[in-house]
């Protein structure tokens, strides 16, 4: 049941103007709130032409091969990206998180040591070729976390500060779903990580989460 304001002890509630909102009192079935027999139930939110336009834009962004598309499988896009210093974002993360003066905490609430920084930095010390190679195109075969550095170790700001520490991992950028196209810019020295371009983010993912593709596969995949 909801809690009346006069039942709340003075000083025991962060905001006395608010009361409890018991989720159990509200149906979690969408049909309760949008009845299937309502007059406008089958009316689309956007018309079919608009739906198709946005769907085509999405497909182009992921798999488009023309000079305007930003697909990781698109040689026009990747070639242009490589000419713009593709290593800049990678090197910025290395400088921010692994420089001698950087101060970050691990999951044990202790500061990361210089040795840890050196190990991770050494694993990133690989060259990014500024020439496009079709053989570096790939596809994600499982859900994969995208990391700012090639490590699964979390990296936190001062956990003593409000809004910092767990679970706010500075190295966790995003994730990629199975079927997402990628282009590998480089691999870590231990070969366990690949620094990839995806349609939405560039970062480090586990090598085991990627499968190589060739032109035959790409042609078939795009036609699906």
Predicted regions and their residues:
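Boundary regions of SH3-family modules and the immediately adjacent low-complexity/disordered segments
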Residues: 3-167, 174-177, 183, 192, ...
């Amino acid at each position: 049941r909801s809690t009346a304001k006069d039942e709340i002890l003075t000083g025991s509630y962060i905001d006395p103007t608010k009361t409890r909102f018991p989720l159990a009192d509200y149906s979690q079935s969408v049909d309760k709130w949008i009845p299937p027999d309502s007059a406008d139930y089958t009316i689309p939110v956007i018309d079919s032409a608009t739906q198709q336009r946005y769907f085509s834009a999405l497909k182009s962004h992921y798999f488009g091969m023309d000079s305007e598309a930003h697909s990781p499988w698109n040689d026009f896009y990747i070639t242009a990206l490589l000419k713009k210093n593709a290593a800049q974002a990678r090197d910025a993360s290395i400088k921010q998180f692994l420089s001698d003066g950087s101060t970050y905490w691990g999951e044990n609430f202790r500061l990361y040591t210089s040795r840890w920084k050196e190990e991770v930095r050494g694993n990133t010390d690989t060259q990014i070729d500024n020439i496009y190679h079709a053989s570096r195109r790939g596809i994600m075969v499982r859900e994969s976390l995208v990391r700012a550095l090639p490590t699964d170790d979390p990296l936190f700001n001062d956990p003593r500060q409000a809004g910092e520490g767990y679970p706010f991992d500075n190295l966790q950028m995003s994730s990629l779903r199975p079927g997402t196209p990628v282009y590998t810019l480089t691999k870590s020295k231990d070969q366990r990580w690949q620094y990839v371009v995806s349609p939405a983010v560039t970062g480090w993912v586990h090598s085991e989460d990627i499968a190589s593709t060739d032109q035959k596969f790409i042609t078939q995949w795009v036609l699906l």
